[in-house]
């Protein structure tokens, strides 16, 4: 696994042949690997989102992530086998210091997560964005913003229009969803698969010109905010 993590875009091989080069064996399958880090405050649901995507269900129990929690899922996109590595990072600073350089290495995309029922987690987003700027070498790495726990309607503190304004300011598409609600399983899937499709095709998010001449990144065919609750 270490070798997979070290390169910016690795190719992994698998073969059903017991002996390399055996007669009649097909060439080994090749899979591109994309490393996506999921960051945000503790208890915003990062682990639950990654677990929902990789395991297809909500975890029976969760504990605070210490360091990095790593999950991987292989998917087929347009006939190509792709491996998606999700790095679920600790939200508490005391668990992060020794790991920061490691999990930011060779990142292909970033998912920022906040808890829609916790305004403090939303206010922490600028600090997470600044951390990314300090450790990521490339400026064109795709980034998306995810508001989690939208099923808790009566407890929501972060209105969609406020989150959308923040997303526009930082050139990110916004998604609102719930990792817990089983009805949103396909929606969590769509978030990560949309990102995987963009990484595979190497297509940038579509540029749109704002009235004050700022450039904003928008999804190519999707509205700026997608809410499935």
Curated annotation (Swiss-Prot):
Mg(2+) binds at residues 47, 65, 88. GTP binds at residues 43-48, 62, 65, 91, 148-149, 151, 179-180. Ubiquitous. A motif (Switch 1) lies at residues 56-68. It is found in: Golgi apparatus membrane; Golgi apparatus, cis-Golgi network; Preautophagosomal structure membrane. The gene is Rab33b. GO terms for biological process: autophagosome assembly; intra-Golgi vesicle-mediated transport; negative regulation of constitutive secretory pathway; protein localization to Golgi apparatus; protein localization to phagophore assembly site; protein transport; Rab protein signal transduction; regulation of Golgi organization. PROSITE patterns: RAB. It holds the Pfam family Ras. It is a lipid-anchor. Switch 1, switch 2 and the interswitch regions are characteristic of Rab GTPases and mediate the interactions with Rab downstream effectors. The switch regions undergo conformational changes upon nucleotide binding which drive interaction with specific sets of effector proteins. Although most effectors only bind GTP-bound Rab, ATG16L1 effector binds both GTP- and GDP-bound RAB33B. This is Ras-related protein Rab-33B. Its EC number is 3.6.5.2. The modification Cysteine methyl ester is found at residue 229. Transmembrane segments: none annotated. A lipid is attached at residues 227, 229 (S-geranylgeranyl cysteine). Interacts (GTP- and GDP-bound forms) with ATG16L1; the complex consists of a tetramer where two RAB33B molecules bind independently one molecule of the ATG16L1 homodimer; the interaction promotes ATG12-ATG5-ATG16L1 complex recruitment to phagophores. Interacts with ATG16L2; however interaction is approximately hundred times lower than for ATG16L1. Interacts with RIC1 (via C-terminus domain); the interaction is direct with a preference for RAB33B-GTP. Interacts with RGP1. It catalyses: GTP + H2O = GDP + phosphate + H(+). Belongs to the small GTPase superfamily. Rab family. Prenylated. A motif (Switch 2) lies at residues 89-108. It comes from the Eukaryota. The small GTPases Rab are key regulators of intracellular membrane trafficking, from the formation of transport vesicles to their fusion with membranes. Rabs cycle between an inactive GDP-bound form and an active GTP-bound form that is able to recruit to membranes different sets of downstream effectors directly responsible for vesicle formation, movement, tethering and fusion. RAB33B acts, in coordination with RAB6A, to regulate intra-Golgi retrograde trafficking.
